[in-house]
Amino acid sequence: MTLVYEKSSFVLIMAQIAEAQNIMTRSTSSNDLLSTSAGSPPSPTSAAILLSSSPSPTITIASLPSGLNIVSNPNGNPAINVVLLNVNLNKEEEKMTLGQLLACFPEVPSNIPIQLNPNQHKLRRDTIVSQPVITSKQSSLFETSKQSNIPLSASVTNLQTLNKEKENYNLLNSSTNSLHSLIITPPTSNNTSSNNFVGGNIINSSSEDSILPPPHIITTTTTTTTSLPPRSPMPLPSSNCINIPNNINIPDNISESSTCSLSSNASNNYPQSPPKYNNFEINQNNNNSISLSKSQSLDNILTNSNNNNNNEITISSNIPIPLPPQSSSPPPTRNNQSSPSPSSPQQQNIMPTPPSTSLTPPQSPTLSPSSSTHSTPTQTTTTIKLPPSSPPSTISQNNARKTQIPTTTTTTTTTTTTTSTTSTTSPNPVVNNKNLNTPSSSFSPTKRLTIAFGSLTRSSNTPPPESSIVPIRWEINLNQIKIASTSTSNTNTVSSQNLINSSNTNNNNNNNNNNNNNNNNNNNNNNNNNNNNNSGNNNNNNNNNNNNNNQLYEQYYKLCKGEFQQNTSLYNKTFNQLLDVDINTSLSLLDKCYDSILKSNGIGLLSSKDQYLSTQSKEKDPNRVKSLLSVVKNAVSEDILNVKPSKTMLYFSNFGKTIPINLEVIDECILNNFSSKKVKFKVLMGPPSKTHTINVSEKEGFIGKKSSITLNFSLILKSSIKLRRVVIIEIEGGVRYFILVQVESNKTAFGQPIEDSELVEDNTSFGPMLVPRALVILKQAFFGCNAHLTESIFRLPPANDSEYNIVKDRVNREAIGTTEPHCIATLIKVFFRELPNLLLNDIDPEIFLNFKPTAQSADTASSAATANSSSSGSGNGNSSPNNDDPTMDPVFIVNLIEEKRRSTFLWLVDLLAEVTKFESSNKMNSKSLSIIFSPNLYFAPSICSAENSFAISGKVVSFILELIQFNKSL
């Protein structure tokens, strides 16, 4: 297998592998580098890494039997431009990068992985944990060369020639849990090798008897950044630095998806175009100073060495931080980070061997491995290092001279986007001064300046949105609740012939009577058993009711005390329970809550003066005269002001009676202020209603101390309704009172269930139909005043509202006494609108959604849905006609309606069909009338989404339109 690495990672590979494998050798007798001819291939028993002058940004690594050379070939001959590497890959190690294996495995890995484990994303990519505490054995790296398959590269041969006194050196410091400082010190040998510099090319030749260390110390400063915009190029280094070419762009990270990425290519052992290095020059004097810096693009490589007191190679690049393997234990947190003691071998500054390569990541904030993060290229960081004020000296046993070794650290600054709720610490760079103040070193702290620029990405760990708030209800119609609770499914259906002729009604009634007789006998037999079980069930029900009342009391208590903020889900749910729960239960619990809140404040039902006198009478110690001032202060400055209303329910002087429609009734409520300060109050009436009008004399104001104020409430019922609603009286610094209103209007033709209405027979095109008597009266008045010939009938409102209210109250009791066509037409619409349960509401919404209208009615659906103001969202009512399915026939849907309601609905369809016959006069066609009446016949339930509600409204229009057309064809 051929592994291709991008050029940006080659610096890291050279720093971590090349030293360990003795790629770079130095002669003990000469400072010159030997070279071979540029075109000569390496020997069969050696391995070579060839730096070609080809502009390709990748380098290919393959296998050779043994040995290792560095060969730079300006001609770019692909035949010799390889380093052969025997690779044995398994599934686990294929998921890790080369840098991860080198950084995380205490032993030499058996293969080189080519990709990152997807599970590694569960760990933070910007996390650097404690310093390594695991030290591998001395020969772990070199013993693998004895195997037949050499895993990483051609290892150092003839290891028996190594000096035994060097075997105690730590060659690899690693930890499976964390990033670490990798110190690789190659052994020395007395054998010599020659290095030559020829024509800008370097050929380092080594034999089995010649193993020499490199002539320098590499100190790597790696700044890993993620940035959206390309980095500005760094300034060119001085003559003491290695200049890297500018014509090759190096990506910041190694990723499988990038163009110059870490990939595997089994079919091609050579790069398409090897990397190009124009110049490579080394000048070595007494003290070596090599500096390698990488800008955004590479152009040249220049290596110089001057006679200064620094011996250093600085590599600045963007290299991805290796992550620990997934199988390892999770990285420790910041609290349990440990750093090696100064006496550890990793921290010794006295190097018996020649200079070594050191990679030292710093301490960094950590995150729990359970959090899922991913890196986001959002920030670019530039690290500027200043030289130490007093550099130390290190004794080298190889040349017996002092070499200055400055201490550097690896600063990593990344910006991540976290998708979990785990909090992160600040990712500021941390300077690791582990070599400071050691027995063999007198380093001063390294001065560092970090400049960060770029836009930071917002964290994605935003809290999830709150659940939708339950809408508040200020009023309910108890008649509708009664109908909703007693409504049953419809089981009787008729065919299209029965739709026209309902002569089978009597037969059905006879069958039902027989069934009822049988059911009565069964019920009599079961009465005794049920009575025996009722006693035990009643006890259980009582316990459940008590528990429910206790929970309801706690909610009411918090509601009255103001612990629930308005327009919140808890506030609205508790507020709605005031309307849903039995009124006697709500009143008793509210009174209990008011008393508990006032008593908890030491107020109770007494005034401040009465409380003071009661407290003084209970005092048995006559010497407690000094407590008078504190008692007065407590009485004056209560936590909750003692203000109470005279009543908590408004009957409008008609308890147990009905209220006439369109007649104003008045009731009053007195607010008593028992506190010793002026109190502000506010009355909340809620939004206006279509069924009634309620007003108060003063919506807000002040109540003087020890005084009271009277609030007058007026109510006008506009339709037949059994009303229950809530009025709120808020006391600033006191209790929030909820005043219940429950009244019932006189029974009229409007607002009554069809089942409870007086039904009479009326002739239609479908045959005789039983409909409410009020509709028959309105129909006669409608055609009597030629309303069917009036333009825009059923569309325009009545001309006089007062006349409209009068006529509405007269319907079904006496002659309506009006000839205004729009008033009569509006009353017909209002009759269907004010039904407790609309005519078509018993039909399942799925039936309307699946209804497929004909082509003509389908064209009407989209425009009808747009005109229907009761729906919102977007939908398309258009559908291809399909009359093959009998369940989609309009007659089938009509049969789903209960019998009395079905007769009323068909009566309306017949009336609308009759009006459309005079379209030339009234300008109202079937489409217009269907759009007008659809919201008065069906309202989509709240469980339907906005899109479905919008679609259903269009289907209802098409359904009504097809029935009108069907009636006109009869």
From Swiss-Prot:
Location of the Rho-GAP domain: 754-970
An example Gene Ontology molecular-function term: GTPase activator activity
Main location: cytoplasm
Pro residues compositional bias, start-end: 321-333
Keyword line: Cytoplasm, GTPase activation, Signal
CC per GO annotation: cytoplasm
GO biological process: signal transduction
Gene3D superfamilies (alphabetical): Rho GTPase activation protein
PROSITE patterns membership: RHOGAP
Record InterPro entries: Rho_GTPase_activation_prot, RhoGAP_dom, RopGAP1-5
Superkingdom: Eukaryota
Listed Pfam families: RhoGAP
Region named Disordered: 30-49, 258-285, 312-446, 487-550, 860-886
Entry keyword annotation includes rRNA processing: no
Sites marked Arginine finger: 795
Residue ranges with Polar residues bias: 392-406, 427-446
Leader peptide range in chain numbering: 1-20
Composition-biased stretches (Low complexity): 35-49, 258-269, 334-383, 407-426, 860-885
CDD domains to which the protein is assigned, alphabetical: RhoGAP
SUPFAM superfamilies according to UniProt: GTPase activation domain, GAP (SSF48350)
Localization per Swiss-Prot or TrEMBL: Cytoplasm
Function recorded in the entry: Rho GTPase-activating protein involved in the signal transduction pathway.
The name this protein goes by in its record: Rho GTPase-activating protein gacK
Organism in which the protein naturally occurs: Dictyostelium discoideum
The organism's taxonomic lineage, starting at the top: Eukaryota, Amoebozoa, Evosea, Eumycetozoa, Dictyostelia
